[in-house]
Amino acid sequence: MQILRNIAEVKDFLALNQGKEIGFVPTMGALHAGHESLIKKSVQDNEVSIVSVFVNPTQFLAGEDLENYPRNEARDIEVAKAAGADAIFLPDVSQMYPSDISIKAPSALASILEGATRPGHFDGVCTVLAKFFNIIRPMRAYFGKKDTQQLIIVQNLVKSLFFDIEIVPCDIIRAGDGLALSSRNSYLGESELIEACKLYRALVKAKALVSAGTFSSDVIKAEMAKVLDPLKIDYIEICDRELNSIDQIQTDKSIILIAAYVGKTRLIDNLWL
């Protein structure tokens, strides 16, 4: 596996692999089994797979955890290599942001859910991804469904800016207790890890209600809130596949999304129905 630290090295690597199908897995590091599954999917689908590790400052708001975000470059390199990546791109901020030009995320999608409490977050996401897409020019890019809103916004970005890239959604990877894998899980203490499983249990409750014939969004959200108690709930929303809020669940067309605080750590999870 090649370790690439600047754009010139990426261009040289791509020149050596000209004409091959390129898969791309963008990450902020602190790689775990969820990221590993994305990398393995890329390796399966493409002739060459590139992983990026970059803690993108423009998607963090003032007071968020940019400085404390978990970083372990040596382990990230090990995980990417073990998963079969052909190259890992580890740029610094000066490489990615030589100027302050940015991209605005679509306001209708970026101002709800995560965007309601993190204004500007998705502008940072879209800006850095547009840069990576231009540098690497992949055929396919891989995103986990855990960040569903990000996934849908990226699909919109690619369509709107005419990037010739297939966005490949990948299923959420969970621990044995159902907790969705996340780099921010490293912030949780032992008792908080147990409490964090309530997010998944609330989604399981929702799925059981739908299976039993309950489709009312209000009823389902109320029952989910009981499961989440006493966690501080940021939101429970039930939407269609374009993130429009809906009153009734339609099977194979709906998504249930949760954001809640476990101690000081904000976690998200979702279920596609």
Q: What do the PLM-derived regions correspond to, one by one?
A:
Residues 2-230, 239, 271:
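Nucleotidyltransferase catalytic core that binds NTPs
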Residues 223-273:
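Phosphate/ribose-recognition catalytic cores of enzymes acting on nucleotide-derived substrates
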